[in-house]
Amino acid sequence: AKALTCSDLSNESIQLLSNLHDNPSEAFGNYNDEHAILILQLYQQCPTASSFATEISSVFNQKKQEILLQAASTSFDEQLERYCVLGLAGQQLSQAQVNEILSSQQVDGGWSTDYDLSRSTTYVHPTALALCALIKSQQNGGLLP
């Protein structure tokens, strides 16, 4: 995934990055890996980017039920994914859990965007990455009310 900076937050990039819709053409029918990972990168760098936060918040709120339903399904059972969903359910995602999620996605200094079965214990569903970023932002006093 290409690293973006706060100055890259044009309306076009906001719309692009906020697309969390399922993409059946991708392997395993995953949500868009690159978008979710870029969202996480940008939240790390630009937690107060208000227009970006507003757009992502809007998309997230529209998708909340759908995401929670997916989280209850047997196909959505990675432990780190559940951390994010539990945070959505009103429980707190600790900084240690956030750090664990971030570190598990670091591969050779970059960000993994592939579903690697050999790393299935540390793989985090791309939508969960976006949710973790949202939860972290919420804890930092931004994004969600």
What annotation goes with each model-predicted range?
Residues 23-24, 107:
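Kelch-like beta-propeller repeat domains
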Residues 1-14, 25-49, 70-96, 116-142:
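An alpha-helical repeat/solenoid feature that recognizes helix-turn-helix modules
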Residues 17-21, 59-68, 98-102:
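Buried hydrophobic core positions in alpha-solenoid tandem helical repeats
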Residues 102-121:
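Conserved blade-ending motifs and adjacent loop-strand segments that build the rim/top face
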Residues 51-61:
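Short helix-loop boundary/capping segments
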